[in-house]
Amino acid sequence: MYRPEIKVVDCTIRDGGLMNKWNFSKEMVKEVFHGLAQAGVDYAELGYRVDKKMFSPEEFGPWRFCDEKDLRDVAYECDTKVSVMCDVGRTDYNAFLPADESIVK
């Protein structure tokens, strides 16, 4: 039975990053996003958005930080919405663009 109130969230990149410190290539993340979009997944959680003052970009890959530019390099406007996870106390919420300017929805 189809239930439109149920939404599907894929966290492959965000959760998988726990194993490799979010060191996925942009090409791989782009392919994952495209596959999710083709499959009709509602939300693609592409990583964390944490403050670079707390975590070193030399130690962690780009999906630990989810800069807007990196997200736009791999995702595109479609029915699948881009999401990121935030941890209270580890995120600079001022770094988020307003929703109407961001690919993160």
Language-model features and meaning:
Residues 22-31, 101:
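Glycine-rich anion/phosphate-binding loops
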